[in-house]
Amino acid sequence: MAAIGVHLGCTSACVAVYKDGRADVVANDAGDRVTPAIVAYSKNEEVVGLAAKQSRIRNISNTVMKVKQILGRSSDDPQSRKYITESKCLVIEKNGKLLYEIDTGEEKKFVSPEDVARLIFSKMKETAHSVLGSDANDVVITVPFDFGEKQKSALGEAARAAGFNVLRLIHEPSAALLAYGIGQDSPTGKSNILVFKLGGTSLSISVMEVNSGIYRVLSTNTDNNIGGTHFTETLAQYLASEFQRSFRHDVRGNARAMMKLMNGADTAKHSLSTLGSANCFLDSLYEGQDFDCNVSRARFELLCSPLFNKCIEAIREVLEQSGFTADDINKVVLCGGSSRIPRLQQMIRDLFPAVELLNSIPPDEVIPIGAAIEAGILIGKESLSVEDALQIECSAKDILVKGVDESGANSFKVLFPSGTPLPARRQHTLQAPGSISSVCLELYESEGKNSAKVENKFAQVVLQDLDKKENGLRDILAVLTMKRDGSLHVTCTDQETGKCEAITIEVAS
């Protein structure tokens, strides 16, 4: 049987298939192995991928990009607010949901982020079917380690709406290790692996322990202010300054001209990973004036040196979190398209001079290949439960329970700190006045660091129809069990009457 692995990133998507014992990435109908995660809307059609990217200059207000950044998030989420400010396609709130407003001239329509993701998943399914046939729909989807339950759920729903049978979701660093066979090549050995992922909009670094074929995340960190787009923007700003120097026109305030410069900078950036220089020619950039500029790799490296330094500093921070030094790392895995940049690879080699740097698989294909391998494992062993097939993980975020302090203000108690090895079990006693007939236990995830932390509610358990007491308090015992696959089972029991309620929050599969 055949299976599929899909990685939907912020700027691109990629699909791999597992067949006859091996996993391979499938090229789309344009012949490209990676598809831009962009959807453009016109009067009569919805266009996905390269065609949408190429048309965005003339149809920018109806072109949706980076949908993954807003998927499953509410309007008051800090990341949503940042996205709404930066998006060229208008995002509004309607009936409590975020929607894209599409105006093609005849009428306005409103499109959900989940529906945009559905179209991208449909493109991935169509690409996979080109080599597997239409009967193959079993898929494993990758998710960032810091995705919350709502983001995972939205991603899974979009994939199912596209016609996929979602076997499960797998964390991106785990997929990267699977792609290189780490843990399978020496199942009895123990090693520490650093996974460096520099994607389109973010940098994610994880330190993972591999022991007897089992994966465990020791520490992880994501920085949404460093990504391939930031390198492109840096180069585009330089090109804008060169145009101004040559023609005395500042185009930084012209959205159309800057989009052209971004396209040119993106092409030049990719060329500079293999060439010493790249030519950037833009036809009629501004007021009919063509622009022709040559950029050397040395110039690009100088412009982006602050970003390179931030990447290396992020590695040092993750090592410190895990209590490791560079000498404790056995292998470094590179993934994400921007990890191709030669200067960045050299800086990582300098930091880990005695460590094997794994980059033989194209870095933007590593994660979907690992997902396809996981899908092959799952469908190949029908008697294997999803939990048993899953590499051991740790909790990605702090899991908290909401309470009230002595002053009456809301307070939060951390039950599962980020990084808790799974499986894990916690108990929490909730006290409530005996005079009320229902009690609600609210569960939250935290995002961000220190003063920037934000608590997001993702589940609740309600005990109803409790017998009222005139005096005193009632004790509600909550038992929370998080399995190896990240699913959470919660049981709340009234200690006096034995009445209980239970819920299970699945791992969005």
Curated annotation (Swiss-Prot):
Keywords: ATP-binding, Chaperone, Cytoplasm, Nucleotide-binding. InterPro entries: ATPase_NBD (IPR043129), Heat_shock_70_CS (IPR018181), HSP70_peptide-bd_sf (IPR029047), Hsp_70_fam (IPR013126), HSPA14_NBD (IPR042049). One of its GO terms (molecular function) is ATP-dependent protein folding chaperone. The keyword DNA-binding does not apply. It holds the Pfam family HSP70. It is found in: Cytoplasm, Cytosol. Belongs to the heat shock protein 70 family. This is Heat shock 70 kDa protein 14. The lineage of its organism: Eukaryota, Metazoa, Chordata, Craniata, Vertebrata.
